[in-house]
Amino acid sequence: MSEFVERLKEYIKENNLSVTALAKKIGVTRETASHIVNEAHMPSTQAFIALVEYFNCSADYLLGRIDIPQSDSFDSVKPIGEILRKCLKDNDKKETDLQNDLNISSSLTYKWLHDKSTPTIINYIKLADYFDCSIDYLLGREQ
């Protein structure tokens, strides 16, 4: 079982939620919630954000990237564009570096930088590793 699913199940148990109740809390169908809990697939970015906001937990902790749950309060999620531009600038990188180094298409990075779409959870992980930052930082939840 993945670290993500183990931790998600812990939060579900701590909050006495059924899969149906979880689905309602995060705005997905019962079937989708069941697939997430049973590792059939990762949640969409929107559903993942709903999970971390509902449980008020660190995205990095829920994904198993850090071992200590943070109990801080988090800011609301912000669009990726401004944050990604700051990461590129702070790391002296260009958009083309990001595309080449992570094998990500120019159309995708354009959409992220202009807030036309959000990265998948897998791409958030790649970006966090690339910029050596937390996923919570990329989500705008921490400064």
PLM segments and residue spans:
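A short, Lys/Arg-rich alpha-helix, primarily the initiator
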Residues: 1-17, 69-93
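Conserved hydrophobic/aromatic packing and binding residues within compact polymer-binding modules
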Residues: 8, 22-23, 33, 62, ...
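Short, structured motif recognition centered on aromatic/hydrophobic residues
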Residues: 8, 45, 84, 95, ...
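The alpha-helix within a helix-turn-helix
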Residues: 12, 23, 52, 88, ...
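DNA major-groove recognition helix of helix-turn-helix
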Residues: 12, 37, 47, 55, ...
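Recognition helix of helix-turn-helix/homeodomain-like DNA-binding domains
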Residues: 27-42, 103-119, 141
